């Protein structure tokens, strides 16, 4: 096994035993990144920074070293990294190098992590296939019949990099499923924490009431380790919760006897593929065999979640993206003689924003306009409150976690949805958006392969602030599924 193929936990132990140096581990990842160019997962590599951090980690080894000392990670391009290009995969931020560090990356560096570079993503995190990036498509390391497949979105580069062993783990963000869907498509683990568990400061905003950062890893244990380093109160983020961060790794006891797992009847969608239904049934059996009690529950407002999400998220995006005007930073259009400031705004945004971002900004502006605010935006906010109430009632009735599919299918081909109705692409989020609307933690765990040999995942949804319990349930599911498959290397 090459060093870049290790999990965080395995690498941590090997580093502690002196069997491996952080420099060797980092070099193995940098070599893998060079070989992995066809995946287009990394869009900016930082070998000098990485090796400096690795040497510092080797010097620190021993007492007082952080939980991630010497562990090489990839960072989604949505996170601001001081002095390193941070473009949110958008032409409008081309060349932007922040003069500050996001809270998440600061915490990772404090824990001793090594930054290998920045990862591809959908532009401004708007997409489910990583096809809206100014850097071009990220490619799933899993392949069928020589077709290039999507790694999912928006954290597609993060998912592809982890699945292909280009890095030991990566950061992602999740607004409506952007950690969990790519994780399911690539056979890795991805957790969206409770809203407010991880600081959003220094992360380019999409929809501020929905965005949440989280880890994308090779195992549930790694997710627990990485989340422990990312989480915590941040006075710079007013939505960051001032509550203690438990030891997530210590919570992985593997004992879920007597725990109650809810199965929401509303997630049995019309036309659900038989493979997804069978996978869900298998997940129920695995948790029951581990001693959990399986109960049917109702989340009656689930059917309204997708339309509510695609009103609220674009509305918030249209407000957040108004700051990109060509005045202070990023791209500015070339102006003709006689052009005024309005012309500059219009030309800059037309050149800088891609089609999907423009579409969502227009939707958001429309639903916030005077004649439609009550009909669309206010109604969507009321639906959101009802969706949250459904979950609150299920948890109040004693349910400890909820099991659902993570995605309605396995990964599809790049370009296959290009001419489809945008709503068809939005349906990829059908199982995940409720979690963001309710502010809950959710995790995708790889459980099996479909008939084509592509990975499929199941989603577990937890009580608010109970990532520890959620991770333990996921740990049990992971062990029972025994998913160890890796993509056959073609790149």
Swiss-Prot record:
Signal peptide residue numbers: none
Annotated catalytic residues: 76 (charge relay system), 154 (charge relay system), 178 (acyl-ester intermediate)
Enzyme class per UniProt: ligase
A Pfam family matched in the record: Amidase
EC number: 6.3.5.7
Keywords, ordered alphabetically: ATP-binding, Ligase, Nucleotide-binding, Protein biosynthesis
Gene Ontology process terms (BP): translation
Swiss-Prot/TrEMBL catalytic activity: L-glutamyl-tRNA(Gln) + L-glutamine + ATP + H2O = L-glutaminyl-tRNA(Gln) + L-glutamate + ADP + phosphate + H(+)
One Gene Ontology CC term in the entry: glutamyl-tRNA(Gln) amidotransferase complex
The keyword Transit peptide belongs to this UniProt entry's keyword annotation: no
GO MF annotation, one: glutaminyl-tRNA synthase (glutamine-hydrolyzing) activity
Family annotation (InterPro entries): Amidase, Amidase_CS, Amidase_dom, AS_sf, GatA
Subunit and partners: Heterotrimer of A, B and C subunits.
Family per record: Belongs to the amidase family. GatA subfamily.
Protein's recorded name: Glutamyl-tRNA(Gln) amidotransferase subunit A
